[in-house]
A protein has these predicted regions:
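Sec-dependent signal peptide recognition
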Residues: 3-10
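C-terminal motif of bacterial Sec signal peptides marking the signal peptidase cleavage site
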Residues: 14-16
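Bacterial signal peptide processing site
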Residues: 18-20
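Beta-rich carbohydrate-recognition and catalytic domains
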Residues: 23, 28-53, 63-129, 138-189, ...
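Hydrophobic core register within WD40 beta-propeller blades
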Residues: 60, 136, 198, 270-272, ...
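Repeated scaffold domains used in trafficking and secretory/extracellular systems
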Residues: 134, 188-197, 267-270, 324
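Long, low-complexity, proline- and polar/charged-enriched segments
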Residues: 194-201, 209
């Protein structure tokens, strides 16, 4: 198996090791208008493949015509006919194509990674660096995929985030096995950020950014859709505290922090989606270890955003050594007002290798707030 114990530390790079915060909504209360429930019927989508033995991250992109691209982080691939992780291959990312229905409980999924010799990452490494997914968006004729570059490092974890990588696919209606990736330049601030949670609203593509490595402050950029459709991001601007939208040359400092809170209030993975009433909903995990899934709302992509409000506690958060993370919504999926997933791991050394109930993404049904 390939570096299993280094893998166990992977999410710790991106999460502050603090106790879960006290969750409140925007007016200081503790009640949420939304609620959640587990969805085991949909969980089966990830447990039918004989070789794909689980992964984290779990981002989706609606490709149209009941086709949904799933992007996963660190992944276990069976070495033979036996479905066990103790002797599995370990790769840095994988993908799946959901088809047949936008309802995951009624759909099928075809998983993908590079083959030939031994399994390898679906989105390939670059030398000694690898990539973790950070979401994507289907435009009219173009697919944009967002990744976080991870470098080896001499810190306690052995690696660190090293900025974003954005690639485009010009033929998203074709089979993913035939896709060619073209790098596009996305202007970012002078300090390192990870890009994710792209959402289209009006004539713009909005993209969120997390200061990483750093304090997990969340910022927002917008790109004219006309430019994004042809891979031109030169018109990208960032939302500032007092001067509106500015390009990177005129930022003059840090962009506006759009998510209130700090530490584990600001998860390294989250989603943002437009709601039917014109407002916006963010879904994330909050806390560390025994986390909850929480939501935020805002009237516009740049806010003002509410503080996170807990709506669901995964059953795995009650376990000894719980390590539950990667909560996010999936706006292209049907079966609930909001379909969300989370990843369940363990801080108990080696447990994820033997406990096959862990590390398959879990579905949650949320009611719209």
């Amino acid at each position: 198996m390939m570096q299993p114990m280094r893998w166990l530390l992977v999410p710790l790079l991106l999460v502050a090791c603090e106790a879960p915060p006290h969750l409140t909504n925007a007016d200081g209360g503790t009640l949420c208008a939304s609620a959640g429930s587990a969805w085991p019927e949909a969980d089966a989508l990830f447990q039918r493949d004989p070789a794909w033995l689980g992964a984290d991250a779990a981002y989706t992109v609606d490709l149209g015509k009941a086709r949904v691209l799933w992007l996963f982080g660190d992944t276990f691939i069976a070495r033979g006919a036996v479905r066990q992780r103790t002797d599995a291959y370990f790769i840095r990312n994988s993908a799946a194509l959901q088809s047949g229905s936008y309802d995951p409980s009624a759909a099928s999924a075809k998983f993908a990674w590079k083959t030939g010799g031994t399994p390898s990452s679906w989105f390939p490494e670059n030398g000694t660096s690898w990539h973790w997914p950070a979401g994507g968006v289907r435009l009219t004729t173009r697919l944009l995929l967002f990744w976080t570059i991870i470098h080896p490092a001499s810190n306690a974890f052995g690696f660190e985030a090293a900025g974003p990588r954005v690639v485009s696919v010009d033929s998203p209606d074709s089979d993913p096995s035939s896709w060619a990736f073209t790098d596009v330049k996305f202007p970012t601030p002078a300090f390192p950020v990870a890009l994710q949670a792209p959402v289209v609203s009006g004539t713009y593509l909005f993209v969120y950014a997390i200061r990483e490595p750093g304090d997990h402050h969340v910022y927002i950029a917008r790109v004219p859709l006309k430019g994004a459709e042809v891979g031109d991001f030169s018109g990208t601007t960032w939302y500032t505290p007092d001067r509106g939208w500015q390009d990177v040359a005129n930022l003059g400092g840090e962009p506006a922090v759009v998510f209130p809170g700090a530490g584990t209030d600001n998860a390294p993975e989250f989603s943002v989606q437009a709601q039917k009433d014109g407002t916006f909903l963010a879904v994330q995990s909050v806390g560390f270890g025994a986390t909850q899934i929480a939501v935020r709302t805002a009237p516009a992509p740049e806010g003002p955003w509410t503080a996170p409000c807990a709506v669901f506690q995964p059953s795995e958060s009650s376990a000894q050594g719980a390590f539950v993370y990667a909560g996010k919504g999936h706006p292209g999926l049907l079966g609930a007002d909001v379909v969300a997933t989370y990843a369940a791991n363990s801080l108990t050394s080696g447990k994820v290798l033997t406990d096959m109930s862990l590390y398959f993404p879990r579905f949650v049904k949320l009611t719209a707030p």
